[in-house]
Amino acid sequence: MLTKKEQRLRRARQTRIRIAQQGVARLTVNRTNLHIYASVISGDGSKVLASASTAEADVRKSLGGSGKGGNAAAAQIIGKRIAEKAKAAGVEKVAFDRAGFAYHGRVKALADAAREAGLQF
């Protein structure tokens, strides 16, 4: 029987394979207890086109003195930033790669904010 982490990694691997077959850029999300990270990777997987995380100094300042990067409000900020950076890099349409994480909470907040900022997926 697979552990919870092994199941998540298996789902993530299967998703990456399906997205690679489509050949479109992918928006990847990784979350930890303290931070959330997002990056837009080219269709062939060879280049990172844009990235944003709550570990960046600018984002930490905008979160205030608390520096809490592991909540839904921080995920919304990252969603807006990654959409702006992706559009600046010329990417408007992506496939959403949630890395096996459930589409709930911080992952959903990031995705919704990116959609509102104009990224299509």
Swiss-Prot record:
**What SUPFAM superfamilies has UniProt attached to this entry?**
Translational machinery components
Q: Which GO terms describe its molecular function?
A: 5S rRNA binding; structural constituent of ribosome
Report the domain of life of the source organism.
Bacteria
One GO BP annotation of this record: translation
Q: Which UniProt keywords apply?
A: Ribonucleoprotein, Ribosomal protein, RNA-binding, rRNA-binding
Specify whether Repeat is a keyword of the entry: no
Q: Which family does the record claim for this protein? A: Belongs to the universal ribosomal protein uL18 family.
Q: What does this protein do?
A: This is one of the proteins that bind and probably mediate the attachment of the 5S RNA into the large ribosomal subunit, where it forms part of the central protuberance.
Q: Which PANTHER family match?
A: 39S RIBOSOMAL PROTEIN L18, MITOCHONDRIAL, LARGE RIBOSOMAL SUBUNIT PROTEIN UL18M
**Quaternary form?**
Part of the 50S ribosomal subunit; part of the 5S rRNA/L5/L18/L25 subcomplex. Contacts the 5S and 23S rRNAs.
What name is this protein filed under? Large ribosomal subunit protein uL18
What is the protein's species of origin?
Acidovorax ebreus (strain TPSY) (Diaphorobacter sp. (strain TPSY))
